[in-house]
């Protein structure tokens, strides 16, 4: 009899542990996660248990809230949360500016005009990860801007785009996102979409 009760309790606990799922936890912006540090970003095959999209077929005006401390972006249609993305915002000294903005530009195939590589005439990298403000061009080299696919300009030189996510703020001020999420955000916003960036 005692064994039967233990079995019932064990089965009940198993079912309770399965309830809610990932999305129930992600819908609460106060939920904390331990980020993957030092590994590849989600677009490079790493596991991303944070990002999701449920906005297809949902009506309502788009808006985005980015929480820098959480390194998360939340996509809303009307008042409904339809997507969450892991992000990597600006590192120390290149902080992503907090504030309220409206999307000013969309460029699917954008490349940086400030950060990238110096390459030779054949496209071989001569000097990697250069900053045009600081790094002199070697003789015969040309500048190739860092690719920023699905670029959504927020203000000045800051935008959201597909990029590497190491699990902490690492960019020059932009908000990097996994490729699948950059695409979803890109195709669901228009110029003028409100974006709020919170410290």
Segments and roles (model prediction):
Residues 1-18:
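Sec-dependent bacterial lipoprotein signal peptides
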Residues 10-12, 110-118:
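Hydrophobic alpha-helical targeting segments used for export or membrane insertion
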Residues 18, 22-24, 29, 94, ...:
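Exported/periplasmic cell-wall-interacting domains
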Residues 19-102, 111, 121, 198-199:
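Intrinsically disordered, low-complexity
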Residues 68, 77, 105, 156, ...:
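Pocket-edge structural micro-motifs
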Residues 79, 106-110, 184-188:
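Structured segments of extracytoplasmic/periplasmic soluble domains
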